[in-house]
């Protein structure tokens, strides 16, 4: 199935929402280590209260969930073999970029090389699924179908000669 430009852009937006919010969620949830309650149920409730009353956590969380909703809606019309690599691979790249912007250490030259290779791989995935590539593939399939039909005709002609 060929992917439209809108579908690819929606998947890139999902990756940006998922990956871009991860460093923000990590930073905003740093205060959870200070929450200590006697039972696991009280601990859970206090942690939820701490997180959801913190707007620094809540805003990235809601954006992240919007990414999940968009992903779910996009999957209805997008090939899964395209959606998963785009979203997951690019989310990692967006996480590294936003993390670097926030002052985190992302790993130097190897991380940058990994990002470049990931973008090249995703570009190949996208290129192989765009409509013009699909038309070329259909053209090739048409040639294979013609060859297949020719073989069938020759085979049926050979059989009729045997029985005729």
From Swiss-Prot:
Subcellular location: Membrane
Ranges that cross the membrane: 1-21, 82-102, 112-132
Pfam families in alphabetical order: TMEM234
Main location group: membrane
Key words, A-Z: Membrane, Transmembrane, Transmembrane helix
Membrane topology designation: Multi-pass membrane protein
GO CC aspect terms: membrane
Presence of the UniProt keyword Transmembrane in the record: yes
Keyword Transmembrane helix in annotation: yes
Organism superkingdom: Eukaryota
PANTHER family: TRANSMEMBRANE PROTEIN 234
Family per similarity comment: Belongs to the TMEM234 family.
Name of the protein this chain belongs to: Transmembrane protein 234
Organism of provenance: Homo sapiens (Human)
């Amino acid at each position: 199935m060929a992917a439209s430009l809108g579908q690819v852009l929606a998947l890139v937006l999902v990756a940006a929402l998922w990956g871009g919010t991860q460093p923000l969620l990590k930073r905003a949830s740093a205060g959870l280590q200070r929450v200590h309650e006697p039972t696991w149920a009280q601990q859970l409730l206090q942690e939820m209260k701490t997180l959801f009353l913190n707007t620094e956590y809540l805003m990235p969380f809601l954006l992240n969930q919007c990414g999940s909703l968009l992903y779910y809606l996009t999957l209805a019309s997008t090939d899964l073999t395209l959606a998963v690599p785009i979203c997951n691979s690019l989310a990692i790249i967006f996480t590294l970029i936003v993390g670097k912007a926030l002052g985190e250490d992302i790993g130097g030259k190897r991380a940058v090389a990994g990002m470049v290779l990931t973008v090249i791989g995703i570009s190949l995935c996208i290129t192989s699924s765009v409509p013009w590539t699909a038309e070329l593939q259909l053209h090739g399939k048409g040639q294979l179908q013609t060859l297949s039909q020719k073989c069938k005709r020759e085979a049926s002609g050979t059989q009729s000669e045997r029985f005729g």
